[in-house]
Amino acid sequence: MYLMSQTLDVHSINRNGILIRGLIILLCAGIINATSVFITPLATYYGWEASAIANVGTTMLTFWPIGSLLGGKLLQKFGGKAVTIIGAIVFGAGLILTGLVPDTAPGLLYFTYSFLIGMGNGITYCGAMYCVMGWFPDKKGLAAGLCMAFNGGSSAFLAPLCAYITAAFNVKVTLFSCGIVCAVICILCGLGMRSAPLVYVPEGYVAPSDGAALSSQYESYPISKAWKTKQFWLQLGAMAFFPSFYLIMFSRFSMFMTDKGIDLAYATLGVSLYNIGNVVGRLLLGKLTDNLGFKKVYMCCWLLCMICGLLLLTGSSVAMILLAYICLGAGFGATNSVYPVMSTTSFGPVYAGNIYGFALLGYMLMTQVIPRITAATIESTGGYTVAFIMAFVLCTLGVICGVLIPKLERPRLKETESV
C-alpha cells in the first residue's frame, strides 16, 4: 500500500500548498456542473433531440460515482500525485475526444462524454478532495467546505465562459479547448500533490483539554472492514435518501417556474440563486462541522430542505420559490461537505475516499429511480404534490440514518508511520 511503502519528510511539505493545488484541480473539475450549456449546441450539431443528448449527460452522472469509487481506491494504493494525474488525463481526454466525434457517429458520445468524462471527473474529484483532507485532520470541515465550494462554485463563471466560446466559435472548439486547458492545469497541480502520512498531526497542533485525539491517530478501516459495520450502511442510506428534493428539481429548476406561469427571466435568476446558496452552504456549514460535529450540521441541512419543500409545495409567489431555491442550494450543497467528514470521522482518513465511493452507489441508484418516479407522478397527476411528499419522507429517512451513526471505536495507533 502506498501510504505504508513510501517515505516523506513531512516538514518539507506545506499543507497549504497541497490545499491550493487541490482547490485549483477541483475548480477545473467543476466544469462537469456546467455541461448543461453543451446540450443544445450538441443536439443541433448531431441532429439529435435535446432529450437524447441530455440522456448522454445523465449516463455520465451514472459513471461519475464509479469513477469516484475508483479514485478512492487509487488514492490509497498510489497516492495523491498519481491519482490526480490519472484522473486529469482521463477527464481531459473525454472532453477532447468529445470535441472530435464526427457528426456521422454521435453514438460515440456515450464513450467520450458519458464514460470518459464521468469516470475521469469522479477519479479527479475524489482523489483531490481526500488527498487535501488528509492534511487537515484538525480542520476536516473547513477543508471539505473549501473543496466543495470551489468545485460547486466554478460553474458560476465556467458556464457563461463556455457559452461565450461556443457562441463565438462552436461547441466542438469549446470542448476541445476545455479538455486541453483542464488536463494541463490539473496535471501541473497534480505533480505537487502528496498524500499525508499515517498518524499525521499538523505542526503546532494543540490537543483539546479533554485529551481527544485526531481521527488520523486511530487505525483506519478499509472497505473490507467498513462494510461490515452499521456506520457504513447508515452512511450509504443517508447519501441515498437525503438528496431527494435535489434529484426532483435539478433538471426542472426553470421548468417548475415556467409551469407556474412565471417569466423565464425569474427562472434563470432562480438557478443563479440556487448556485449561490450551494456555494455558501458548502463553505459555511462545512466549516461548522469542525465546531458542532457533522450530525448537528446534517440536521441543519435537513431543516433547510424541509423549508424548501414547504415553499415549493405551497408557494405561489416568485419570492417564495426563489427562497426555496436558495434553501435547497444551501441545504443540499452543504451535505457535500458533510459526507467527507462523516467518512473520515467513522473510518479514518486512509481509506475514506474509497469508502465514500462505495457509499455513493446508493446515490447513484437514486439518480436513476427518483427522476423516473417524479416524471411518472407528474404525468399521471399533473402536479408535483406526490413527488414532494415522497421527497419529504425520503429526505427525513436520510437524516435519521445520518444522525443515528454511532461512534466507531477504532484502536489508537501508537507510533507515527510516515509516507
Language model regions located:
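Extracytoplasmic gate region of multi-pass secondary transporters
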Residues: 35-39, 224-285, 370
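Helix-to-loop junctions at the C-terminal end of transmembrane segments
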Residues: 67-80, 282-293, 378
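Hydrophobic core of transmembrane alpha-helices in multi-pass small-molecule transporters
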Residues: 106-123, 320-333
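Helix-loop-helix hairpin linking two adjacent transmembrane segments in secondary transporters
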Residues: 151-198
